[in-house]
Amino acid sequence: MILSSYSSFQSVLCCCCCRCSVQKRQVRTQISLSREEELSEKHSQRQRPWFAKLMGKTQSNRGGVQPSKRKPLPPLPQEPPDERIQVKALYDFLPREPGNLALKRAEEYLILERCDPHWWKARDRFGNEGLIPSNYVTENRLANLEIYEWYHKNITRNQTERLLRQEAKEGAFIVRDSRHLGSYTISVFTRARRHTQSSIKHYQIKKNDSGQWYITERHLFPSVPELIQYHQYNAAGLISRLRYPIGLLGSCLPATSGFSYEKWEIDPSELAFVKEIGSGQFGVVHLGEWRAHIPVAIKAINEGSMSEEDFIEEAKVMMKLSHSRLVQLYGVCIQQKPLYIVTEFMENGCLLDYLRERKGQLQKALLLSMCQDICEGMAYLERSCYIHRDLAARNCLVSSACVVKISDFGMARYVLDDEYISSSGAKFPVKWCPPEVFHFNKYSSKSDVWSFGVLMWEVFTEGKMPFENKSNLQVVEAISQGFRLYRPHLAPMTIYRVMYSCWHESPKGRPTFAELLQVLTEIAETW
């Protein structure tokens, strides 16, 4: 091996012109190494990567022009991506604060800045600018199905059929996401010729290898909207042509993440109490109105029932959790005692009461749809790394459209009642807890999965108390010995298997909420 060195210099006389000068000429010195020395040198270079790098540069310049000593200019900074996208309003929105911008359904707007995931700065066609809720708009592209009235992103098969039967129009249709990822389903309502019976047919919209969409392979289309447009004029294999699109668009305003951007504290003078609608772990709950036009639920927190300072900080985090299957927290009132928690109002109240009051009237498909709603909300909390800690039918609420939403997520941590956090107390939700919680007080998303299995049992028993003839201590002993809840008579074996999978003794043996949602969706499509 030969090493080249440029560290030695010689002085030479320059005679090329009348003004002589002394220059330093770099002289390469070659050193021959033995085999042992060569191996030692390679080992040293591996131990000193900076040296090996230097040697590599020296070798590459051998016999060439000496590289410039000037450092290259740093690369120009990348321009931030342009956030200015065109959107279309899905709902009307009235400004709530001076910095808000009004939205009119179906109008186009330009997004100037995404302040956070839930509030964006926008400009209308008149040049007015302000903040808007991001869940009230969608990107205005032809390929974006959300701009079409007939498309429903978050809807179950049962909810679809209920909407179509309410309209009861020949050819009424809805397009929704299929249980098969990347495909869609058209649901069509039709009446029999004698007008005594009606039926709903479901057709899957598939995509072939060349990227074309179809229901039957005889009719291929480059996009889903073009497929829908064709079948609005031609049945072409469907039970009826697509006559009337059925949409939720604009009919039911979704809750916003807070009343405005970074507004978590609510002035109590802006609240009007209408009537008492119930009581919970923390105090009385009232139906109220915010600024006389937005219905809200107002929870008055009894003094001493909650660690208030800790909860106020947590409330700021909880407000950023926003999903169509979560009861939205709007803010808190802290200027007086008792403290008020202001949330989205749900017309049909507590799920547990809803089930008990309608016992014998609810179809199995609706019960499954309720479980899907809850599982969808819990899958969102799972993705957000947020633990509920007290998932049960009593902590879920039902909307006027029979959509079930999860309430009181995370609040169990701030209860100061010793009975609530003691496995021997009546208020502790032992009957919904897995072994690792009542033995070691260890919560995780998988402990929520156990509770979800018990909640499914509540739903399919139409509101029965789990382990109704056992005390909390007996429940702890029974669960520890491997005892599990029996199969409700309304639950087919496929449903009971899902429940039972949630009650694995080891958290690692339980499915995730994402996996549960996929299984429940597949079951719903076969009913």
Swiss-Prot record:
Domain of life: Eukaryota
Domain SH2: 150-246
Binding site for ATP: 277-285, 299
Compartment(s): Cytoplasm; Nucleus; Cell membrane
Location of the Protein kinase domain: 271-527
Tissue-by-tissue expression: Expressed in early thymocytes, T-cells and mast cells.
InterPro entries: Kinase-like_dom_sf, Non-receptor_tyrosine_kinases, Prot_kinase_dom, Protein_kinase_ATP_BS, Ser-Thr/Tyr_kinase_cat_dom, SH2, SH2_dom_sf, SH3-like_dom_sf
Modified residues (Phosphotyrosine): 91, 420
Residues at the active site: 390 (proton acceptor)
Enzyme Commission code(s) on record: 2.7.10.2
Region annotation Disordered: where it falls in the sequence: 58-81
Ranges where the SH3 domain occurs: 82-142
Catalytic activity of the protein: L-tyrosyl-[protein] + ATP = O-phospho-L-tyrosyl-[protein] + ADP + H(+)
Coiled-coil regions listed in the entry: none
Gene Ontology molecular function terms on file: ATP binding; non-membrane spanning protein tyrosine kinase activity
Biological-process GO terms, alphabetical: adaptive immune response; NK T cell differentiation; positive regulation of cytokine production; T cell receptor signaling pathway
Modifications the protein undergoes after translation, according to the UniProt entry: Phosphorylated at Tyr-420 by FYN. Autophosphorylation at Tyr-91 is critical for the activation of TXK, leading to the up-regulation of IFN-gamma gene transcription. The cysteine string at the N-terminus is palmitoylated and required for the proper subcellular location.
Regulation acting on activity, per entry: Activated by phosphorylation by FYN.
GO terms under cellular component: cytoplasm; nucleus; plasma membrane
Keywords per UniProt: Adaptive immunity, ATP-binding, Cell membrane, Cytoplasm, Immunity, Kinase, Lipoprotein, Membrane, Nucleotide-binding, Nucleus, Palmitate, Phosphoprotein, SH2 domain, SH3 domain, Transcription, Transcription regulation, Transferase, Tyrosine-protein kinase
Membrane topology classification: Peripheral membrane protein
Pfam (any one): PK_Tyr_Ser-Thr
Subunit text: Interacts with PARP1 and EEF1A1. Interacts with SH2D2A. Interacts with FYN.
Family: Belongs to the protein kinase superfamily. Tyr protein kinase family. TEC subfamily.
Function statement: Non-receptor tyrosine kinase that plays a redundant role with ITK in regulation of the adaptive immune response. Regulates the development, function and differentiation of conventional T-cells and nonconventional NKT-cells. When antigen presenting cells (APC) activate T-cell receptor (TCR), a series of phosphorylation leads to the recruitment of TXK to the cell membrane, where it is phosphorylated at Tyr-420. Phosphorylation leads to TXK full activation.
The protein, known as: Tyrosine-protein kinase TXK
Species of origin: Mus musculus
Primary gene name: Txk
